[in-house]
Amino acid sequence: MINLILLGLPGAGKGTASESIVDKYHLAHISTGDMFREAMANETPVGLEAKSYIDKGDLVPDEVTAKLVEERLKQPDTKNGFILDGFPRTTVQAELLEGITKRLEKPLTNVIAIDVDEDVLIKRLSARYICKNCGATYNKISNPTKVEGTCDRCGGHEFFQREDDKPEVVKNRLEVNKKMNTPLRDFYEEKGILSTVNGEQTPEKVFEDIDKILSKD
């Protein structure tokens, strides 16, 4: 059984890697965002508790998020293993998760950090641009328009960049994430379950390296 967390800064490629891992190993992909939406829509007790904070614009306390994660990990689709997306974000959450996995007898088997140099991440994240006419999203590095300056979808010629994709904003976002990511890495390194892969390779090669780590266990 594989019970896994992927770590990495925004733009490191965690989403793409998660999809490949789920496809090959048939793991339950557990995203905290999806969990919140589902629990609130189904009006479960924990979902309603989370909603009371979200409706006021407050952050959902760690204990409530942890309850939601525990509820989700009890579902039958996690019997082959799971990959956690968006939790834990802090060492406090990591400790709460440790309690949950012990209670459910579903210990974490792997924590894999996808490492990408900060300058590369800034280039990746600030390369996004959007068609003014139809909203189609492109990336100068990984997904440019087929004809330069012309939208593939509507043929429009005007594009814009979102404020939060501008290099100085991206840099600040990475700094904030790094402050949370580093203690988490240290936490799992001490537990002896942290592995790292080079995220500056092609998505296929990144998955190949992750696959080697997961196949060892």
Swiss-Prot record:
Pathway noted in the entry: Purine metabolism; AMP biosynthesis via salvage pathway; AMP from ADP: step 1/1
PROSITE patterns: ADENYLATE_KINASE
Keyword Transmembrane tagged: no
Stored SUPFAM superfamilies: P-loop containing nucleoside triphosphate hydrolases (SSF52540)
Cellular component, GO annotation: cytoplasm
GO biological process entries: AMP salvage
Binding, AMP: T32, R37, D58, L59, V60, G86, F87, P88, R89, Q93, R162, R173
Binding site for ATP: G11, A12, G13, K14, G15, T16, R128, T137, Y138, Q201
Region (LID): 127-165
Region spans: NMP: 31-60
Keywords: ATP-binding, Cytoplasm, Kinase, Metal-binding, Nucleotide biosynthesis, Nucleotide-binding, Transferase, Zinc
Chain positions recorded as Zn(2+) binding sites: C131, C134, C151, C154
Disulfide bonding pattern of the chain: none
Predominant localisation class: cytoplasm
InterPro entries for the chain: Adenyl_kin_sub (IPR006259), Adenylat/UMP-CMP_kin (IPR000850), Adenylat_kinase_CS (IPR033690), Adenylate_kinase_lid-dom (IPR007862), P-loop_NTPase (IPR027417)
One Gene Ontology term of the molecular function aspect: adenylate kinase activity
Catalytic activity from the UniProt record: AMP + ATP = 2 ADP
Uppermost EC category: transferase
Subcellular localization: Cytoplasm
E.C. designation(s): 2.7.4.3
Pfam families tied to this protein: ADK, ADK_lid
Cited function: Catalyzes the reversible transfer of the terminal phosphate group between ATP and AMP. Plays an important role in cellular energy homeostasis and in adenine nucleotide metabolism.
Subunit structure: Monomer.
Domain notes for this protein: Consists of three domains, a large central CORE domain and two small peripheral domains, NMPbind and LID, which undergo movements during catalysis. The LID domain closes over the site of phosphoryl transfer upon ATP binding. Assembling and dissambling the active center during each catalytic cycle provides an effective means to prevent ATP hydrolysis. Some bacteria have evolved a zinc-coordinating structure that stabilizes the LID domain.
Family: Belongs to the adenylate kinase family.
Name of the protein described by the UniProt record: Adenylate kinase
Biological source species: Lactobacillus gasseri (strain ATCC 33323 / DSM 20243 / BCRC 14619 / CIP 102991 / JCM 1131 / KCTC 3163 / NCIMB 11718 / NCTC 13722 / AM63)
